[in-house]
């Protein structure tokens, strides 16, 4: 599938032959050819947003281009492609999402708007499509297949059946059916899923999968049912099984689930990995600003043992082949000029990013204009009268129950990564007619509530979900810090001491001119210990020399203080003046004698 048609193909042919000048040449680069795996010096000529020629070293241009960008010896690679993403998780509109991820090298995303579809139906999906057209980020949409996600188990703001999915598939920039989460319905050939999948198959469109813990006969039935990819593998064995079954695997690193290292273990021992690409799924705005987007997946995959060149290929060429994009994912004649310049093939932030041959980001800054507020005409859909305060999240026992404990089905995560593994019955105490989990810091309450004003909510108990969140302040004291289940309380004094320790270890590297060198901590403690001994010795001498007349050290002073002399309960503190140097560290205190 060609994602963009050239306005005038004849012009591209003429530019390739050197008969007309190109718009842009990116030169002085180390060209990474994701098709062959080679790296060699080259220059790339671009016209009308397409690559027309890759000139190897020694091949001169016939006509100079209108503009030239010096790559300064950096690697030239294609723009990253995210094979599966929910824009709603970023809390941004598509137009503003481009500002956040283009500087990180992502130039194409394939999105599933089922979250806004669950709330606003077709109107919500249309809004995402129209707003995406205003950005310089290439955004393709897949029609949500499971709205609601679990029919009969939840209430949604809309319902997508075959008719609604077919209507979406006929829209521009809709390229397939999004994650088919009802894999049970697929393998049992339910009428609802069968008719929805048929809408995509009749049009020859991409069918995206979503089938965690799927093996053997069930996996075979799911693959035959239509889906060709999966991003929900939870361990290495599942990755191997799905690759062997002919499914595309999307290595995922999201803000919610981070099990990428386990997934890499399942594919790095395979000799061929052409069916492996990458995705982010759900990523929060904070992570986009701090660690990036697809480049963060690349970084983690490299850290897990994969070769940087192969991971870049997964994030570009493999991703494009998965969707059948014939003009994306590589830098070659006839391909769209979505390009980035990077210092290394390790997921680092790009120096420059181009979409269709236009510079859109440089040095981590978006060059496409100011952030905009969407023309939002969708109604407010959040109406939750059943959530009125803390009492709304109390799990009550059945009326008339008089026992001290009650058996509760507790949901349990796998390895603390928030993937629901199983449910286990647990005896929990009852207090004031409600389940009490205060004695177990690994338990939290979770609540699922209807947000459409229809009332109703469900409260359950979850174990090991709190690895990533602090529930109550007192739990920091109850839970041993060595277990690492909850973050430590941030003590300003502790933070300052650690900063001073780090600066001392760094030596003179962070010390401004004129600042005295930091004393070793052992010497500093020794000086304080010697000072205390000297003060106690002087006190003893004064008590001996003035047993009755010294107000501060004699009997009168002792009577006034309620005990004799300066013992362990009360020590005279010298007047200390602390000097702080320009680097923020504390130099040796100076003592004024009284």
Predicted regions and their residues:
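Metal-associated gating/positioning segment near the N- to mid-region
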Residues: 62-131, 483
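Active-site mouth loops of central-metabolism enzymes
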Residues: 82-93, 149-162, 228
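Active-site beta-loop-alpha junctions enriched in small/polar residues
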Residues: 86-88, 114-116, 144-149, 180-183, ...
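Histidine/acidic residue-rich metal-binding segments in metalloenzymes
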Residues: 124, 159-179, 185-251, 257-278, ...
